[in-house]
Amino acid sequence: MLTPYGYPTILKTACIAILLSGAAHLFAKPLLPEALIFSVFLLLFTLYFFRDPIRTPPDKKRTVLAPADGKVLLVKPVNNHFTGPSSTLVSIFMSPFNVHVNRIPVDGTVTLLSYHQGTFMMAFDHRSLESNEKMEIGIENKELKLHFSQVSGFLARRIICSLQQGEQVERGKRFGMIRFGSRVDVIVPAHVEVTVKAGQHTKAGETVIARF
């Protein structure tokens, strides 16, 4: 299954592959085999990158799900304008080889949606949390306020977020992606227990990262 978020890029890549192979056939036949191999590889990688496997959220109430596939970079205490003091940050790094479709961590209402321009530092550099381009999202329900950010990186310079202010959302549902790697930072309030640690791998919409 492919994500619709990737359709424009897939179409552009297919056109480039066809044009490249056609140009080699017309003007540089000795290079045609290499052009075909490169074109096929480019198209296959693009299809692989925009894959969107089916995910089934666990039947565990009062849990926070990972919004992204990847590896937990760090877990640390922070103060946050949305979740309050003594909150906890869980940062998930997505390599170019991870599934990049992002999913909703908890049921609730979108009460914060704020885009910030910024730099494009390497996503695994912790300074990127503050300085990089990002989309901040806040979800509230009767039991907690959750803050998370789609953060761009050195390669990932296209954040896609389909959420709307005031929208009712369900845990595990798709809401966007970050193209070609980066990170998603989740911040939970003080009363929420984080259940993952640095180095652990996550799957969006399936891995429980906290409980409340």
From Swiss-Prot:
Membrane topology: Peripheral membrane protein
Keywords in alphabetical order: Cell membrane, Decarboxylase, Lipid biosynthesis, Lipid metabolism, Lyase, Membrane, Phospholipid biosynthesis, Phospholipid metabolism, Pyruvate, Zymogen
Subcellular localization, as worded in the UniProt entry: Cell membrane
Catalysed reaction equations from the record: a 1,2-diacyl-sn-glycero-3-phospho-L-serine + H(+) = a 1,2-diacyl-sn-glycero-3-phosphoethanolamine + CO2
Free-text remark on how the cofactor is bound: Binds 1 pyruvoyl group covalently per subunit.
GO molecular function: phosphatidylserine decarboxylase activity
Pathway: Phospholipid metabolism; phosphatidylethanolamine biosynthesis; phosphatidylethanolamine from CDP-diacylglycerol: step 2/2
Cofactor(s) for this UniProt protein: pyruvate
Tree of life domain: Bacteria
Self-association state and partner proteins as the record states: Heterodimer of a large membrane-associated beta subunit and a small pyruvoyl-containing alpha subunit.
Family classification: Belongs to the phosphatidylserine decarboxylase family. PSD-A subfamily.
Name of this chain's protein: Phosphatidylserine decarboxylase proenzyme
